[in-house]
Swiss-Prot record:
Taxonomic path: Eukaryota, Metazoa, Chordata, Craniata, Vertebrata
Gene: TRAV12-1
Matches recorded under SUPFAM superfamilies: Immunoglobulin (SSF48726)
Limits of the Ig-like domain: 23-112
Function: V region of the variable domain of T cell receptor (TR) alpha chain that participates in the antigen recognition. Alpha-beta T cell receptors are antigen specific receptors which are essential to the immune response and are present on the cell surface of T lymphocytes. Recognize peptide-major histocompatibility (MH) (pMH) complexes that are displayed by antigen presenting cells (APC), a prerequisite for efficient T cell adaptive immunity against pathogens.
Pfam family, any one: V-set
Entries under Gene3D superfamilies matching the protein: Immunoglobulins
Locations listed in the record: Cell membrane
Domain of life from the UniProt record: Eukaryota
Record-given protein name: T cell receptor alpha variable 12-1
Residues glycosylated per entry: 43
Main location: membrane
Subunit structure: Alpha-beta TR is a heterodimer composed of an alpha and beta chain; disulfide-linked. The alpha-beta TR is associated with the transmembrane signaling CD3 coreceptor proteins to form the TR-CD3 (TcR or TCR). The assembly of alpha-beta TR heterodimers with CD3 occurs in the endoplasmic reticulum where a single alpha-beta TR heterodimer associates with one CD3D-CD3E heterodimer, one CD3G-CD3E heterodimer and one CD247 homodimer forming a stable octameric structure. CD3D-CD3E and CD3G-CD3E heterodimers preferentially associate with TR alpha and TR beta chains, respectively.
């Protein structure tokens, strides 16, 4: 069984990493109230022009985030979900078309 000391060290390392990365990515604040059937856009800007990998995660209530979509070039589309990347403006967005109640979640932008 993992000791409390080990857990605290792991938590400290994770918090230190988050603190060091704090200005790298900015995401539009939420929450958004979107009527069913509408299109919603989540926007994210990043400051490191050397970034190569871009990801959108979906986190349902009280669950771990799950990878929704990865983007390595200008964009990616999967059904009702579209990710668009503009490297010149250091901007990435996630569009959800024909929104459904089941789309209710937290959406997270990750830049690597």
């Amino acid at each position: 069984m993992i000791s409390l000391r080990v857990l605290l060290v792991i938590l400290w390392l994770q918090l230190s990493w988050v603190w060091s990365q704090r200005k790298e990515v900015e995401q539009d604040p939420g929450p958004f109230n979107v009527p069913e059937g509408a299109t919603v856009a989540f926007n994210c800007t990043y400051s490191n022009s050397a970034s190569q990998s871009f990801f959108w995660y979906r986190q349902d209530c009280r669950k771990e985030p799950k990878l929704l979509m990865s983007v390595y070039s200008s964009g990616n589309e999967d059904g009702r979900f579209t990710a668009q990347l503009n490297r010149a403006s250091q901007y990435i967005s996630l569009l959800i078309r024909d929104s459904k109640l089941s789309d209710s979640a937290t959406y997270l932008c990750v830049v690597n």
